[in-house]
Amino acid sequence: MKYRTRKLIKPEDLNPRKTLFGGRVLQWIDEEAAIFAICQLNSPNIVTKAMSAINFVSTAVVGDIIEFGMDLVKVGNTSITIACDVRNKITKQSIVRIDEIVFVLLDENGKPTPHGKSKNI
C-alpha cells in the first residue's frame, strides 16, 4: 500500500472527546479514494458506490500527522475497488481501515459505463 496524502490534525477536526471526529476522517477518505480512482481510470466521471465495514482501530489527537494509503484490490467492468488504511505517520499505528471502497465510472448520461481497464492499471 502506498501512502500519499497527509493531514495535520487540528482542533476543528475533533469530536467532543477531543479525538479525531469519525465523520471528518471519512470525508477525507472518500475524497482521497476518489482522487485515486480518478487517476486510475483517467476520468473524473466516477461516483462512490459502496464502502465495506469501516474499522476504527485507534484515534488521533491535535498535532498528530495522519496519512492515507490506497491500494487497488479489484477491477470490474464498470467499477474499481480500493482498500484504504489511514495511519499515524510517526507511529505507523492504523487509525481506520476499509477493505473495499467501490467506485463506478459513469457516461455522459450518468449511467455505468465500461472503463476498459484491467488489474494492471
PLM features per residue range, with description:
Residues 1-50, 104-121:
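Hot-dog-fold acyl-thioester-processing enzymes
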Residues 1-5, 56, 61-62, 73-121:
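HotDog/MaoC-like acyl-thioester-processing domains
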Residues 51-55:
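Short alpha-helix capping/helix-loop boundary micro-motifs
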